[in-house]
Amino acid sequence: MIFVYALLALVITFVLVPVLIPTLKRMKFGQSIREEGPQSHMKKTGTPTMGGLTFLLSIVITSLVVIIFVDQANPIILLLFVTIGFGLIGFIDDYIIVVKKNNQGLTSKQKFLAQIGIAIIFFVLSNVFHLVNFSTSIHIPFTNVAIPLSFAYVIFIVFWQVGFSNAVNLTDGLDGLATGLSIIGFTMYAIMSFVLGETAIGIFCIIMLFALLGFLPYNINPAKVFMGDTGSLALGGIFATISIMLNQELSLIFIGLVFVIETLSVMLQVASFKLTGKRIFKMSPIHHHFELIGWSEWKVVTVFWAVGLISGLIGLWIGVH
């Protein structure tokens, strides 16, 4: 049956994207490109965005089918809440951007507050309905050390979900980059889930994986559609949630290493400019730095995918040992 769920997720996305693209074009829901960005990106102006709606809809439909036919699918209900919650924040952000015809959507404060709200509701639902057995301790990779957080674990959950939601969002700046890295990441978490005996979470990861495989052909260079914040914020939130539900939180540092590096590059760039007036990179996130030193977009994407695959395998090894 897992094969059926995977095929359903793949087909729904693959069919929906070519239906959605002309609709988005007709509604003029095109991406605005930063003027200070690489000049090679200016030709992407007007490319339809909000494509994440397709794979999110695929995930929701397929997951509902699983919930109907699979016993003990409660973890999937919780993951669906996170998917829809973070996806809705991204959708609102995208909608404001395309209506205003600029690259500014929700304010940072509005976005953070909404994300924090989803994270807190996730924790409350998990506890009230006993859907997650929180360890409240963080296990340090390669050691037998576990750091007890007690009530501070709630703060960690909020930080983890909000942080990775925005990390994937920052990474989604090149054609196919975030999609490919997410495919790698969900592959690792699918394997980890089945090894750890978390079948429902494993099935959800398979659904994520194949829904994104249906989206990738339309998103690789030259992209016919972008996932937008609708997709990227949801993906990051889901990654963090899965790592929490598996009690393998720090495995995400490796499985999502490229997302972490991209985020750190932005933080370092901002800090350096504020403190010294100088920039460390030609542009951040760091994928733009490599473009500006002469790498083609496709080279940056494939190298980052390779890094994501290697670090993802390390994260998988950490999670199953």
UniProtKB/Swiss-Prot annotation:
It is a multi-pass membrane protein. Keywords: Cell cycle, Cell division, Cell membrane, Cell shape, Cell wall biogenesis/degradation, Magnesium, Membrane, Metal-binding, Peptidoglycan synthesis, Transferase, Transmembrane, Transmembrane helix. It is found in: Cell membrane. GO terms for molecular function: metal ion binding; phospho-N-acetylmuramoyl-pentapeptide-transferase activity. It comes from the Bacteria. Its cofactor is Mg(2+). It catalyses: UDP-N-acetyl-alpha-D-muramoyl-L-alanyl-gamma-D-glutamyl-L-lysyl-D-alanyl-D-alanine + di-trans,octa-cis-undecaprenyl phosphate = Mur2Ac(oyl-L-Ala-gamma-D-Glu-L-Lys-D-Ala-D-Ala)-di-trans,octa-cis-undecaprenyl diphosphate + UMP. InterPro entries: Glycosyl_transferase_4 (IPR000715), PNAcMuramoyl-5peptid_Trfase (IPR003524), PNAcMuramoyl-5peptid_Trfase_CS (IPR018480). Pathway: Cell wall biogenesis; peptidoglycan biosynthesis. Signal peptide: none annotated. Its EC number is 2.7.8.13. HAMAP family: MraY. Belongs to the glycosyltransferase 4 family. MraY subfamily. PANTHER family: PHOSPHO-N-ACETYLMURAMOYL-PENTAPEPTIDE-TRANSFERASE (PTHR22926), PHOSPHO-N-ACETYLMURAMOYL-PENTAPEPTIDE-TRANSFERASE HOMOLOG (PTHR22926:SF5). This is Phospho-N-acetylmuramoyl-pentapeptide-transferase. It comes from Staphylococcus aureus (strain MSSA476). The gene is mraY.
